Amino acid sequence: MHILLTEYVVRVYTQRIVAAMESKLTLLGLLSAGPGHGYDLKRSWDHWFAASKPLAYGQVYATLARLVRDGLITQVETEPGAGPERKRYEVTDTGRQSVEQWLLTPVTPAGDVQADIFAKTVIALMLDDDAGRLLDLQRAEHMARMRELTRLKQDGDLRTVLLADHALFHIEADLRWMETTAARLNELREEVRS
């Protein structure tokens, strides 16, 4: 059960973290930690991000080729292997500057969950359905997720705890939004009908 919850948290809740994440800059950031092969980057990506944003080996190598082309990384050596040659890459000064700029550029907060709930609420009101019931059902779903995440944090490693905290804070914001919206349903109903 604990493993399933961990996989659930990593898969579902990190989607908000990496949904808009650029693979190119993320791989460049991973490579900034030190020179490495495409295989090393893929392993690092899989460890941190694959549950919510899988990346195929082909994407890794295609991205590395673009990074070389753009002057953000350089190939520093080639090692013979059992299969294809293993190319080792290193970030250039321009690449480091790109990573620094990327790290200092704030990510636009995603409102996807609220937008979906809002759309359902408006449509429910348009159809004279019970929008309050819809919000109650959504609130119950959010509360169930909060309980799962809270349990998960008890035995989780630091990565799991941090991801669970991130998800919990987003869920809390969603719940506040639902409460505010529920309190304004009559007002919204009038606006929808006008």
Predicted regions and their residues:
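Amphipathic, well-ordered alpha-helical segments in soluble domains
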Residues: 37, 41, 63, 69, ...
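Heptad-repeat amphipathic alpha-helical coiled-coil interaction surface used
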Residues: 132, 139, 143-146, 153, ...
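Long, compositionally biased intrinsically disordered regions
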Residues: 1-18, 158-160, 176, 183, ...
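Secondary-structure edge/capping motif, primarily at the C-terminal ends of alpha-helices
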Residues: 125, 149-156, 185, 189
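Alpha-helical scaffold segments that form or flank carboxylate-/histidine-based iron centers
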Residues: 56-59, 87, 159-170
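Amphipathic alpha-helical dimerization/coiled-coil segments
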Residues: 100-147
